[in-house]
Amino acid sequence: MQRRGALFGMPGGSGGRKMAAGDIGELLVPHMPTIRVPRSGDRVYKNECAFSYDSPNSEGGLYVCMNTFLAFGREHVERHFRKTGQSVYMHLKRHVREKVRGASGGALPKRRNSKIFLDLDTDDDLNSDDYEYEDEAKLVIFPDHYEIALPNIEELPALVTIACDAVLSSKSPYRKQDPDTWENELPVSKYANNLTQLDNGVRIPPSGWKCARCDLRENLWLNLTDGSVLCGKWFFDSSGGNGHALEHYRDMGYPLAVKLGTITPDGADVYSFQEEEPVLDPHLAKHLAHFGIDMLHMHGTENGLQDNDIKLRVSEWEVIQESGTKLKPMYGPGYTGLKNLGNSCYLSSVMQAIFSIPEFQRAYVGNLPRIFDYSPLDPTQDFNTQMTKLGHGLLSGQYSKPPVKSELIEQVMKEEHKPQQNGISPRMFKAFVSKSHPEFSSNRQQDAQEFFLHLVNLVERNRIGSENPSDVFRFLVEERIQCCQTRKVRYTERVDYLMQLPVAMEAATNKDELIAYELTRREAEANRRPLPELVRAKIPFSACLQAFSEPENVDDFWSSALQAKSAGVKTSRFASFPEYLVVQIKKFTFGLDWVPKKFDVSIDMPDLLDINHLRARGLQPGEEELPDISPPIVIPDDSKDRLMNQLIDPSDIDESSVMQLAEMGFPLEACRKAVYFTGNMGAEVAFNWIIVHMEEPDFAEPLTMPGYGGAASAGASVFGASGLDNQPPEEIVAIITSMGFQRNQAIQALRATNNNLERALDWIFSHPEFEEDSDFVIEMENNANANIISEAKPEGPRVKDGSGTYELFAFISHMGTSTMSGHYICHIKKEGRWVIYNDHKVCASERPPKDLGYMYFYRRIPS
């Protein structure tokens, strides 16, 4: 039976008031225009508050606005009422109780509310055999908190009844988003339901596979009809092979094959030769069991790697997660975990580290009232609001309370159970920060380092006034390139947010052990014997730091002194030191087969780090600078005709490509220019533009484009005229110089063609003999300076320079063979002790594996 108790007390107010039957219709009349029935495109948030992690399971329940369908906890619903004037909310409450035990001790079947069933997608485990729940819904009218119990068909207007039913039966907005997160959804094979499988006694071993017709041990496919193991071919697998699986299909006609090494409890890569495309096999577990493969106990070995590669890393998982030790759970402010949404541990680890930094705490949680009060009408789509919500959830301690013995006894006596919070769910945060990114918006595992840069980019773009907490990571890198032939040098600076440290494998201190282990491992694999105990390479941190500072060769370096390509050498130094230094260990690389591989190494990362010796010194006495001349770009004739068509409206720039480039560490404005000047042809093409132009002085300056007017008359410029007769507008000059031509070329070409961009380009291509006329250039520059008001010099990059001495306070570790798989956890030093954050589990760390980390966070030691 539905519980009809009074509404929990509102903030600073009394409990709810119940209405007499005759008053309900009259009370709702003034609010009817604001009550809506959810349409198909509306998102109904009835699982989680927009400002907090309150849910229907929370003590105060959840309030769903009957106009916007946003949800608010008890502490935040008044804010929404004051801001919007919306008065009618649906209050949802789920009561969880311990099940009544039968005479034999078994739990009785779960009871549900006979009138109300909320289709809630909460993260609490309410399907346990020990608990049952009862759902309650009512309409609440603000500001007097009048309550109308639901359902109430007899007394409510028809529109209100329809709206309430639609809200109660609506699906979670995150479920609606799920289909969009998967690209290229595969069709179900028409052969899967009635697939013939031969009873030939074939049993497939868990490892040691080999093509039945050649010696290949990778890219192997198991035919699901006869159990043949044969190699694939590049056109449907993209990793090479001799095509024996396809030949077998042509000979026998058996249509389906599964790629060995991709089988997991969640599925596998299945290909249909008959349908000529990857497909889904809904009966895959049954088809694999026919050949002795237990799909539920298989672990994927990505891209054809052997299962032994996974077994070798068992010790890595155990060490990083501190398995085998009894870890003490931590509760309270700063000790709240994040639930895993399915491959979301990369996000959880980064956010735990981010919100352990005081500058981020102050910028978001410290400004919580202001950010929440001035949030847009839909706070679920506001970055600063969702950052503040997440930060408060992690730091407040509100969702990390230890169980109290007296409360447990009282709950047992009342047969009621209040679920202990096992962390908060970052669903709303992840949905927003990943929606514009093709990778992070998927449900696949991602690289924590890439997400860190993605987050920094979002912080930069959504800065709160003059406050930008990501400034603590920003530093300047000085790159010195020397032409080996002329010995002349060029110094440039760029902005970066993390230090990428190479793994100096050649400096391993246990080389003899590694060689012996590798020989033993190969012999064991060949003879199918148990693998030897893992021997991990031990790399001195000093060797990695030395590898970072050593000069590197620059292939195809264009020397402006020679006006030709030459050998070059590049060295990198810190032009400034950040307040917080993030160090990424470059553990991941690609093998000869382009398969991602991970260096399984142990590096003695220091607790105290001094990199003052890496401070940049700039141009040294006796050094001669390379001339400031850009390399020419050769554009084929057929490209000239398309050049003008590639220029797009700046408002149509592909922001996803811009963000992908920005996450590589390039300035945001440079990324926008790269995407613009390559005609929205994708991040890869834009990246090539960046490589060519990154040394130009205006590389990071904002993209400024002239407006396009109506059709120009013959011989007239398509751009607006400048204040000086026939003086080329700076915007047009910038377009041409961004294509690699010299400034004086651009100016003379535009003057010769009356500032017509297309004709100016043709003029440049038809005058290859053009040489710089210094008198002409000087005269023109003087005229330009006399007639054009120069803008103020743009503010330089914001950096917080200081000493290069640091102490370690957090690190993120990765377990697995690739950034696209495995698991991430985070260790943070708080209150003088290390704490392990493993998704929703937060415990005191006994043996923090500082030598196995992937990303390290250092804070500056005040000098």
Curated annotation (Swiss-Prot):
Changing residue 739 to E: Impairs ability to stabilize SIAH2 and STAT1. Abolishes ability to stabilize SIAH2 and STAT1. Residues 652-693, 727-767 form the UBA domain. This is Ubiquitin carboxyl-terminal hydrolase 13. Residues 336-861 form the USP domain. The gene is USP13. GO terms for biological process: autophagy; cell population proliferation; maintenance of unfolded protein; melanocyte differentiation; positive regulation of ERAD pathway; protein deubiquitination; protein K29-linked deubiquitination; protein K6-linked deubiquitination. It is an enzyme of class 3 (hydrolase). Changing residue 233 to A: Does not abolish ability to stabilize SIAH2. Interacts with UFD1. Interacts (via UBA domains) with SIAH2 (when ubiquitinated). Interacts with BAG6; the interaction is direct and may mediate UBL4A deubiquitination. Interacts (via UBA 2 domain) with AMFR; the interaction is direct. Interacts with UBL4A; may be indirect via BAG6. Interacts with NEDD4. Its EC number is 3.4.19.12. The UBP-type zinc finger has lost its ability to bind ubiquitin and USP13 is not activated by unanchored ubiquitin. Swapping with the UBP-type zinc finger from USP5 restores ability to bind unanchored ubiquitin and subsequent activation of the protein. The UBA domains mediate binding to ubiquitin. One of its GO terms (molecular function) is K48-linked deubiquitinase activity. GO terms for cellular component: cytosol; nucleoplasm; nucleus. Its main location: cytoplasm. Changing residue 273 to A: Impairs ability to stabilize SIAH2. Zn(2+) binds at residues 211, 214, 231, 244. The lineage of its organism: Eukaryota, Metazoa, Chordata, Craniata, Vertebrata. It comes from Homo sapiens.
